[in-house]
Structure formats: C-alpha cells, structure tokens
C-alpha cells in the first residue's frame, strides 16, 4: 500500500493522497489495480492531460459523482481549464444529456450514413 501511495504522490506531484485512495486502501488489491489503470489511462497520449480531465469531469457530472466532479475539476483547472472552458463544458454536458434523452425517448433510429 505504501508503494502505491508513494507512486500516486510522485505521479500527481502532491504531498498526500486524497480521500478516494485512502478509502480504496481498505482493499489493497483494488487500490493497486485501480491506481495502475488510472495511471495508464490518464497518462499523456493522443489526448492531452487537460482534455482527459475535462472528459473525466463530463462523465462525472453525468454519473452524479460529486467527489469525482470536485477532484477532476481541480485537476482540470491545474492543467489549464479556465472558467470559460468550464462553462462551455457544462453547456455541452447539459445539451448532450438532453438530446440523448430525447433520442432515447423517441426511439430515433440510427441513420444509415451514421452507422459506420
């Protein structure tokens, strides 16, 4: 567990691990597996860190995870997200949720040209 905590602190450049990881430590196997997965997925790749954090915020809002919203909004702000970017992100999340529900409610069939 200590090695995982040390890796989290080093990777995230923070003095201590946040509550999420402390709660996961109740099951060291889950802690290690989850950290390794998060570390791999959130590493720099085709998407830059800010984009990944903003996607995480959007999914967290949709899933209603207050802890994840707070954590990843802070990380996105640290990576450069401005108030204007956050506002647009919330507008997109809200619109996507609304139009998704309408499409599902009306049972709109997928257009042939979209089914690729």
Q: Where are the model-predicted features located?
A:
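Hydrophobic alpha-helical segments
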Residues: 1-116
């Amino acid at each position: 567990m200590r090695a995982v905590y040390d890796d989290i602190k080093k990777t995230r450049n923070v003095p201590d691990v946040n509550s999420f990881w402390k709660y996961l430590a109740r099951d060291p196997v889950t802690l290690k597996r989850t950290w390794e997965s998060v570390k791999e997925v959130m590493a720099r790749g085709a998407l830059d860190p800010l984009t990944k954090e903003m996607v995480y915020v959007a999914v967290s809002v949709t899933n209603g995870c207050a802890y994840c919203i707070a954590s990843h909004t802070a990380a996105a702000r640290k990576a450069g997200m401005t108030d204007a970017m956050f506002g647009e992100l919330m507008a997109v999340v809200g619109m996507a949720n609304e139009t998704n529900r309408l499409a599902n409610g009306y049972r709109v069939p997928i257009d042939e040209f979209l089914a690729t």
